[in-house]
Amino acid sequence: IMGFLMLCMLSIMLPRAAVAADRVEEVLASRTVIHDPKEAKTFAGEKKGQLVFDHVSFKYPGADENVIEDITFTAKPGETTAIIGSTGSGKSTLVNLIPRFYDVSAGSITLDGVDIREVTQHELREKLGYVPQKGLLFSGDIKSNILFGNPDGSDAELEEAAQIAQATEFIEAKPEGYASHIAQGGTNVSGGQKQRLSIARAIAKHPEVFIFDDSFSALDFKTDVTLRKALKKRTKDSTVIIVAQRISTIMGAEQIIVLDDGKMAGI
């Protein structure tokens, strides 16, 4: 009987495995479209973080029309630049150009005077703390997730990042605290907890440029206000870019950019 049951299980698993194998093969066969320059430049040693968009336009590969059209602005250290607009206006696409998930179709983006296409992706991303809308967590524990971008970080840095991100309360409520297990993708924590841990990870990295892509959307109003107040003190010397839907999230921004159908409707 057991042999028959095993045979039935195999007959179910094999087709699923074949489909999964096709998907894995498709990923492995994909060509990288973003490349490092053959003779890469480097950033100056001084910590700055000034980000300049100069007449930036972008369209997805194979598309006929630009989704971002002629965007020009400067985000300065010590200031918060907020980007708002309706759904589909190009907010996330715009900030995804900064870590070079895509390259601009026209114009340029410079960081501290260097075109981001002229440095390696590793060096560029070392300067960035990026928090996507959907908090991304890895299998491991809370500590390893927060210190992912700063593996040599101290316990003091770990706890400070969690405190600023308003994650301390729910972490300390767990029996194992910072050693608590995190499932792949963070499926064993809530959406708000996932976002707070992702924010804590960016804080613990000590980047020059913070990018929050609607990263406060799953937080309640009180937590949102408290977190942003603590974050303002922590990022006083950094460049902060926030994509948001809620007006309350961007009230303290020094610069607000309004996008409409991929174009700047106001600043």
How would you label these PLM feature ranges?
Residues 2-27:
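Cytosolic ends of transmembrane helices, especially the final helix of ABC transmembrane type-1 domains
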Residues 6-9, 40, 161:
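Long alpha-helical scaffolds
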Residues 26, 33, 147:
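Conserved E/DxxT/N motif and adjacent residues on the DHp alpha2 helix
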Residues 16-19, 33, 202:
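Residue-level recognition of oxygen-bearing side chains
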Residues 33-46:
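Pre-NBD coupling/linker segments of ABC/ABC-like ATPases
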Residues 2, 30-33, 176:
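Flexible, glycine-biased helix-capping/connector loops in cytosolic signal-transduction modules
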